[in-house]
């Protein structure tokens, strides 16, 4: 059954490419085997909802970074005011992400390869907040086909048009 789903997805879904492994294809279809986690490091202010109540969280307090599980990503809103944020860097490689020294003006986001649809929605929320503001966006990734595809996905999320 899994093979049939993956084959059909590769044939009919333009965002799915031949270089994606089975797990990545399933994630793109919102079929998750395990909980997704988004690792970030830097000055990001969130509002996390639980029912009708929201708690403000300042991730700059976590100078070594923090991992947001899928439920947190789903229920978090990016605060409109992000005064310290001057640069966003998406990073494909975990070792490179971990090696990035904390900078109070840079938000590092570990992509672990392709961002899941849930992560892309969260990053689009971030994009809407920084739109029209003086925030630069960069990507660090491998210089191979997959790395270029991830760069293009990151560009589509953080489009400045």
Language model segments and positions:
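Nucleic-acid enzyme cleavage-core boundary/entry regions
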Residues: 1-90, 94-110, 116-128, 146, ...
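Acidic beta-strand-to-loop metal/phosphate-binding motif
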Residues: 134-144
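Active-site lining segments that contact anionic ligands and/or coordinate catalytic metals
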Residues: 103, 134, 151
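Glycine-rich phosphate-binding loop signature in dinucleotide/nucleotide-binding domains
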Residues: 130-132
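Short loop or secondary-structure boundary microenvironments that flank
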Residues: 112-113, 141
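Gly/Ser/Thr/Ala-enriched C-terminal appendages of enzymes
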Residues: 142-161
